[in-house]
Swiss-Prot record:
Residues 184-381 form the Peptidase M12B domain. The keyword Transmembrane helix applies. This is Disintegrin and metalloproteinase domain-containing protein 2. A tripeptide motif (NQE) within disintegrin-like domain could be involved in the binding to egg integrin receptor and thus could mediate sperm/egg binding. Residues 19-180 form a propeptide. Residues 1-18 form the signal peptide. Residues 617-650 form the EGF-like domain. Residues 19-688 are extracellular. InterPro entries: ADAM_Cys-rich, Disintegrin_CS, Disintegrin_dom, Disintegrin_dom_sf, EGF-like_dom, MetalloPept_cat_dom_sf, Peptidase_M12B, Peptidase_M12B_N. Glycans are attached at residues 128, 226, 359, 464, 491, 571. GO terms for cellular component: acrosomal vesicle; cell surface; plasma membrane; protein-containing complex. The lineage of its organism: Eukaryota, Metazoa, Chordata, Craniata, Vertebrata. It comes from Rattus norvegicus (Rat).
Length: 737
């Protein structure tokens, strides 16, 4: 059973999210005024990418070295709902060029996360102390207020020790270096419920900026993982909540995931988070462990108690995200991080200053990132800084625009879906473009085909009824047999050797025989090899010859003429075998070689001109998994034949056109279990009965059972005695007679 992770709060005495001096939430703070001075700046295309500031704190000068950190995509939108309940994007403009993170010169364990949009606003973290900085609004100069943030310790533990999901005490700890050569990206959608929206500002611009600060802090903490958290979109429930936000975090997470799967289809995102405000709460968060990239479980709930700092809220979010990547809580006796408090230590919520991931967390992340469960972190979103003003009517969808059909394009559909002067939806329209938007500017019904399968390794997608955009383009899982079991599917294409030959030489060509490959690819010259190195042609090992240069059979009498290439002919065993040779460095040179994923033997495929075992494809879709009536898609979900229903193609429905839980025509809310059980971590001690209280209960039950047995036995004995007495009496009477 998957683990549902809950974070116990105990945060009733932490500082408020936005107020620098909330009564009773912090130690006495010394607020001072400082004037930051910009001393260096590096620009690119008209905007700053690196900047250095000098400022004084308590009379001492510190140097802040900052680098621009983008986390907003160009199509970032903030959504809310109008009076009719229809979700609309808010007309706000956001800058993606003024968010920076860096360090304090001379302090290796320091961290700075600030926005420079309107002055400096953010957090400065030393080893064990944090400072908040923000512009002094009443000042005509560049004055800022700076104050020390010192959250008090909570009166209670953050977790019940018996419930804590710590790693095995025998867990082997190794020193893991961050994988800085590989970048990872996580796209999240954040929903702010009504009370949370009112608590942190009650204004769309103010709340949006605070969420930006939250993501900035989160990204700074995740820097050792080389992970960038992208805020793909933001949603405000300003008038009413779309789901009930009462109850414990377990049930709230279930409701949110159910709502997410039915209604949250805005744009591609990997995880969705619901931020909920409560005066007091036993828990501060919930998520599923290790399920970050599972669409059905990729979500979390963060409960924001009345008194909590922005720093602590960022730690809550980071811990939830880490848990969803399978990163466990630290054993403080064996895990180290170089700073007083590590990120995955529950006490991190109570501390100030820099918090880093421990060696244990780094190893957990390293294991997760090489597993199939991390596939959603591999795609890189476009993060071009949005510093240009949007121009309505230029035909480009820019920041703040819902649609832009150009100078003449708005007349294509009667009536026009897009207002050409505002680049917003026209009155009465619910969509403008996309394959799931009909001619009357309304969303197509759920289940209408929007992307047919283009070949046997592709699958169909349908409109989901809530978005004008067709579902993500899914395809058959890599490794599935195709072309009459001769080849396999790779990235949605049947990797057929015969088709490679036809693509290169025309319809008169076919895939070469083993004799052709063995003969030509053993020569290590222009006619055949396993690639080219700086020293010449690469030799093919006998087992790799089917993966070297592409060798085809040619069945026409016409002479082949290829532009910029030499065609090599060879008569081998009565077959005309041909290959191709481009000049070194030619843009088409890859076509000379057999493609990766081409079958080269039983259970083997080509990879980098070598014939290797196909186990690296991780193909595990047996016919039994989909009950012989479907195939697995690239999410490893069954895509069922017509009339057979997902998720396992076992049940049937006559009108079902086929598909999977990802196709857009399936009610995916059913995939969430009706009940989730808290298996570990952060459960209140008062929520369960101690064992010593249960023992007397069982003793009483046993005593009652014993008494009932004794009474029953006694009554039975009395009946036997009465029966014996009556028999004796009757016997005596008969003898007298």
């Amino acid at each position: 059973m998957w683990l549902l992770l809950l974070l116990l709060s105990g945060l009733s005495r932490l500082g408020g999210l936005s107020e620098p001096q909330t009564e009773g939430t912090r130690e006495k703070l010394h607020v001072q005024v400082t004037v930051p001075e910009k001393i260096r700046s590096i620009t690119s295309e008209g905007y700053e990418t690196q900047v250095t500031y000098s400022l004084k704190i308590e009379g001492k000068t510190y140097i802040l070295n900052l680098m621009q950190k983008a986390f907003l995509p160009p199509n970032f939108r903030v959504y809310s709902y109008d009076s009719t309940g229809i979700m609309r994007p808010l007309e706000q403009k956001f800058q993606n060029i003024c968010y920076f993170q860096g360090y304090i010169e001379g302090y290796p364990n320091s961290m700075v996360i600030v926005s420079t949009c309107t002055g400096l606003r953010g957090v400065l973290q030393f080893g064990n102390v944090s400072y908040g900085i923000e512009p002094l609004e009443s000042s005509s100069g560049f004055e800022h207020v700076i104050y020390q943030v010192e959250p008090k310790k909570g009166d209670t533990l953050l977790y019940a020790e018996k419930d804590m999901d710590l790693r095995d005490p025998q867990y082997k700890i190794r020193s893991i270096k961050p994988q800085r050569t590989v970048s990872h990206y996580l796209e999240i959608h954040i929903v702010v419920e009504k009370q949370m929206f009112e608590h942190i500002g009650a204004d769309t611009a103010v709340v949006t900026q605070k969420i930006f600060q939250l993501i900035g802090l989160t990204n700074a903490i995740f820097a050792p993982f080389n992970l960038t958290v992208i805020l793909s979109s933001l949603e405000f429930w300003m008038d009413e909540n779309k789901i009930s936000t009462t109850g414990d975090a377990n049930k709230l997470l279930y409701r949110f995931l159910k709502w997410k799967q039915s209604y949250l289809v805005l744009r591609p995102h990997d995880m969705a988070f619901l931020l909920v405000y409560r005066d007091t709460t036993d828990y501060v968060g919930a998520t599923y462990q290790g399920k970050m990239c599972d669409k059905n479980y990729a979500g979390g709930v963060a409960l924001h108690p009345k008194a909590v700092t922005l720093e602590s809220l960022a730690i809550i979010l980071v811990q939830l995200l880490s848990l969803s990547m399978g990163v466990a809580y630290d054993d403080v006796n064996t895990c180290q991080c170089g700073v007083p408090i590590c990120v995955m230590n529950p006490e991190a919520l109570h501390s100030s200053g820099v918090r880093s991931f421990s060696n244990c967390s780094m190893e957990d992340f390293s294991k997760f990132i090489v597993s199939q469960s991390s596939h959603c972190l591999q795609n890189q979103p476009h993060l071009q800084p949005s510093y240009k003003m949007a121009v309505c009517g230029n035909g480009e969808l820019e920041e703040g625009e819902v649609c832009d059909c150009g100078q003449e394009g708005c007349d294509d559909k009667p009536p026009p879906c897009c207002n050409p002067t505002t680049c917003q939806l026209s009155e009465g329209s619910t969509c403008s473009t996309g394959s799931c938007c009909d001619a009357s500017c309304n969303l197509k019904a759920k289940g209408e085909l929007c992307r047919p399968a283009n070949q046997e390794c592709d699958v169909t997608e349908y409109c989901n009824g809530t978005s004008e955009v067709c579902e993500e383009d899914f395809f058959v899982q890599d490794g599935h047999p195709c072309a009459e079991q001769k080849w396999i599917c790779i990235n949605g294409t049947c990797q057929s050797g015969a088709q490679q030959c036809r693509d290169l030489f025309g319809t008169d060509a076919d895939y070469g025989t083993k004799e052709c490959y063995s003969e030509l690819n053993s020569k290590s010259d222009i006619s055949g090899s396993c690639g080219i190195t700086p020293t010449g042609y690469k030799d093919c090992a006998p087992n790799d010859r089917m993966c070297g240069k592409l060798i085809c059979i040619y069945q026409s009498e016409d002479i082949l003429k290829m532009r910029s290439a030499i065609v090599i002919y060879a008569n081998i065993s009565g077959q005309i075998c041909i290959s191709l040779e481009y000049p070194p460095g030619h843009k088409e040179s890859k076509k000379m070689c057999v493609r990766d994923g081409t079958v080269c033997g039983s259970g083997k495929v080509c990879l980098n001109q070598e014939c290797v075992e196909d186990t690296f494809l991780n193909y595990d879709c047996t016919p039994e998994k989909c009950n012989h009536h479907g195939v697995c898609n690239n999410k490893k979900h069954c895509h069922c034949e017509p009339t057979y229903l997902p998720p396992d193609c076992k049940n049937t429905e006559d009108t079902w056109p086929g598909g999977s839980v990802d196709s857009g025509n399936q009610q995916r809310a059913e995939s969430i279990p009706a009940r989730s059980y808290v298996a570990s971590a952060y459960r209140s001690k008062s929520a369960r009965w101690p064992f010593f209280l249960i023992i007397p209960f069982y003793v009483v039950i046993l005593v009652l059972i014993g008494m009932l047995v004794k009474v029953y036995s006694q009554r039975k004995k009395w009946r036997m005695d009465d029966f014996s007495s009556e028999e004796q009496f009757e016997s005596e009477s008969e003898s007298k007679d």
